[in-house]
A protein has these predicted regions:
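Histidine-rich, glycine-flanked metal-binding segment
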Residues: 2-72
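Active-site core of metal-dependent hydrolases
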Residues: 173-248
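Divalent-metal coordination cores built from histidine and acidic residues
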Residues: 2-14, 92-199
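Active-site mouth loops of central-metabolism enzymes
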Residues: 76-87, 143-154, 221
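Hydrophobic faces of well-ordered beta-strands that scaffold small-molecule active sites
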Residues: 73-81, 103-105, 133-137, 169-173, ...
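Divalent metal-coordination and catalytic microenvironments
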Residues: 27, 47, 67, 78, ...
Length: 248
């Protein structure tokens, strides 16, 4: 548990009256708030950055950044880990060297095969990973009801339970038929996410402006299916955040 006593030690490290765990000198800081790049040092204590800029506090470990650029960790805002054909551990070896430190994962394939138990097992295993794993709770398990046999079913009750997890950040992508068709089960899943102050991911492939209006009215926050610039602009105009992916 994060306590006031722990916070006090971090403030002392920031002030310079407590020894840092690590200090990284001689870096070029890429400041995404001010859009500047400038020389700086970084002070780290208790696995937190507690000082940035001119940092001279003594540290247990001092690293020479050799003029390298320091940037915030990158976040992949939508990924299906299973389709990478890599385990989360192996995927970490690929993404960490390139600066990605957080994945927002819609593990719909795991859920279709192993249900809620599979998702909980993945979350438990993620504690050992070198990156942060956040969960977009799969909204379509099974994906095609009546046309497939799955190892698990995530109804409204199961989705609501999963949305209570600290690792859950959203309701995973909903395809247009579920929203435009006003299917009550999926509307209840959307409400379960909104009532927990979490967003709902979209999958608005091929939708024109009229249908996009309905989609936006259904509280779908984003879409990763824009192929042409005009599609991206249509989504922006309606407040739907376009996610740009290489596959599109």
């Amino acid at each position: 548990m994060y306590t006031a006593a722990i916070m006090k030690t971090e403030l002392e490290a920031s002030k310079g009256t407590r020894k840092l765990d690590m200090r990284i000198d001689n870096i070029q800081l890429v400041n995404v708030f001010t859009r500047e790049i400038y020389p700086a040092s970084i002070g780290i204590y208790n696995e937190r950055i507690v000082a940035v800029g001119r940092v001279e506090t003594e540290a247990d470990q001092v690293i020479d950044g050799a003029g390298a650029y320091a940037v915030p960790g990158l976040i992949d805002s939508h990924i299906h880990i299973e389709t990478t054909l890599l385990t989360p551990e192996a995927l970490g070896e690929v993404i960490i060297p390139w600066g990605t430190t957080t994945l927002c994962v819609d593990a719909m394939e795991i859920a279709n095969v192993a249900g809620i138990d599979g998702l909980l097992a993945m979350i438990k295993d993620s504690e050992k990973l070198p990156f942060r794993l956040l969960l977009e709770i799969p909204s379509r398990v099974p994906t095609a009801p009546g046309l497939e046999t799955t190892g698990g079913v995530l109804g409204v009750e199961e989705v609501t339970q999963l949305l209570e997890l600290d690792e859950a950040v959203s309701l995973g992508e909903l395809d247009p038929s579920k929203v435009l068709g006003m299917k009550e089960e999926y509307l209840e899943k959307v409400l379960a996410s909104l009532n927990r102050r979490k967003i709902c991911n979209g999958h608005a492939i091929g939708l024109g402006v009229d249908d996009l209006n309905i989609y936006a009215a259904g509280h779908l926050s984003d879409d990763h299916e824009s192929v042409y610039y005009e599609e991206l602009l249509e989504r922006l105009r309606l407040g739907i955040m376009p996610l740009i992916r290489e596959g599109s």
